[in-house]
Amino acid sequence: MEYAIELSDVQFAYTPSVPVLDIPTLRIAPGDKAFVFGPSGSGKTTLLGLLAGILRADTGRVCVLGQDLTRLSGAARDAFRGAHVGYIFQMFNLIPYLNVIENIMLSCQVNKRQRQRLGVVPVREAAQQLADRLGIGDLTTTSVLKLSVGQQQRVAVARALLGAPEIIIADEPTSALDTDHRAQFLTLLFESCERTGATLIFVSHDRGLMPLFNRSIALTEMNTIRLAPTL
C-alpha cells in the first residue's frame, strides 16, 4: 500500500541538546482524517511543520505522497507544499496589505497545479464560493487588518482549501471560531475532503471533536507518537 504520509525513524530538535520529536513509525493512508492531540510542548506544531516541509527532519524519512521531503532543498520543499498541501496556520499568516479575496486567492494564483485542479472555474469565483460558505462573502474587498480574529481564521481556512490540495494540515483551526462558525467550517472541511479524497491532519486541544475522525494520534510528554486503532 502506498501511504499518503509515511514517517520512519524521524528525529527532530531545534537545538542538539533538546529533542522535540522522536517518531519510529507513522503511516497515514490516503483519505484518512487524523486527529492529533497532546499536551502543550509535545511537538504537535513541529510535526505539522515536518509534514508540510517547513521543517526538515534531522534523521529518518518523511514521505508525503511518495516524496521523501528530507531529500529536497528548502526551495523544493516550498514548491511541493504549494502544489500539494493546504495549510491552516495557527497564527493565520495572512498578508496584511491584501484584502480578503486576494489573500484567499494568493496561493492558487502563484501555483499552476492548484489552478489546474479548479478546472474551468475561475480562481476568483471559486474563492468567492468558499468565502460565502464560511460566512465572509460580504467582506471580500475588506482589508484583513479590519477583520476580527474569527474572521481572519476563516480567511485562512478558505485559502487552504482553495485548489483542492491532496493534503490538508490544520493547526488549531477552530480556536477562534464561535459555535455556529465552527460547525460551518467543519462541515465544509469534511465535505471538501470527501469530494477530493484529501488526507486531513488536524491538531486540536478540543478532544470533543475526536469522534469525527477515523484516526487519532497522541503526542506524549516524551515527544513520541502513540497511535490509537484505526476506526
Residue ranges and their predicted role:
Residues 52:
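Helix-to-loop junction immediately C-terminal to a conserved catalytic motif
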Residues 60-68:
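Conserved ABC transporter NBD signature motif
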Residues 68, 105, 112, 118-139:
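Conserved ABC ATPase "signature" region
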Residues 98-107:
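Short coil-to-helix segment of the ABC ATPase nucleotide-binding domain corresponding to the Q-loop/switch region
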Residues 143-147, 151:
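Conserved ABC ATPase signature
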Residues 164:
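Conserved catalytic motifs of ABC-family nucleotide-binding domains
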Residues 168-171:
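Catalytic Walker B motif of ABC-type/P-loop ATPase nucleotide-binding domains
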